[in-house]
């Protein structure tokens, strides 16, 4: 079985804060904007589309400065998509340009907030994604999430 190609955005603003969004389908579950890439899209095209869809942010509102990945996780049984075993994610760190408005009132997220990376809690992430988030925080911020 294959892994579904996926991209995720870690958006930063001056002061070192990052944007996290609470999922609409799971209360108290926070994550970065992310989504699957279509076969005919580059990772950057997929990132721009997903960010626009999920937080209404146009590409000219941020600048990608770093990326790491891919990171893999396996879907829980019954949650497989498109015949895939799991997801293979590339994470992109981007800086806000100016003070863009973040809009999250949609099917993906119910709200958003800016936090310092060291205040992120692994319990906010569904168990299946926790190893990926631990690796992401280690790679981007040199933070070990317990």
Where are these regions (language model features)?
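Conserved hydrophobic "DFG−1" position in protein kinase catalytic cores
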Residues: 11-12, 20, 93, 114
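Unchanged
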Residues: 37-128
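Conserved N-terminal beta-strand and adjoining loop/helix that marks the start
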Residues: 1-18, 36-39
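Short acidic/polar alpha-helix capping motifs at helix-coil junctions
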Residues: 12-16, 83-85, 143-144
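A short gly/proline-enriched turn/hairpin at secondary-structure junctions
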Residues: 31-34
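A conserved beta-turn-beta hairpin within the catalytic core of GNAT-like acetyltransferases
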Residues: 26-28
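Short loop/turn segments immediately following the C-termini of beta-strands
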Residues: 23
């Amino acid at each position: 079985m294959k892994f579904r190609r996926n991209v995720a955005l870690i958006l930063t603003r001056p002061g070192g804060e990052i944007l996290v969004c609470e999922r609409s389908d799971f209360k108290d579950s926070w994550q970065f904007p992310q989504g699957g890439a279509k076969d005919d899209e580059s990772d950057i095209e997929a990132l721009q589309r997903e960010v626009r869809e999920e937080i209404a942010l146009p590409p000219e509102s941020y600048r990608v400065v770093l990326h790491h990945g891919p990171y893999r996780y396996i879907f829980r049984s019954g949650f497989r998509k498109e015949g895939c075993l799991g997801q293979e994610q590339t994470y992109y760190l981007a800086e806000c340009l100016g003070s863009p408005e973040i809009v999250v009132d949609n099917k993906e997220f119910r709200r958003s907030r800016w936090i310092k990376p060291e205040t992120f809690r692994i319990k906010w992430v569904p168990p299946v994604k926790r190893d990926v988030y631990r690796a992401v925080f280690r790679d981007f911020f040199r933070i070990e999430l317990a």
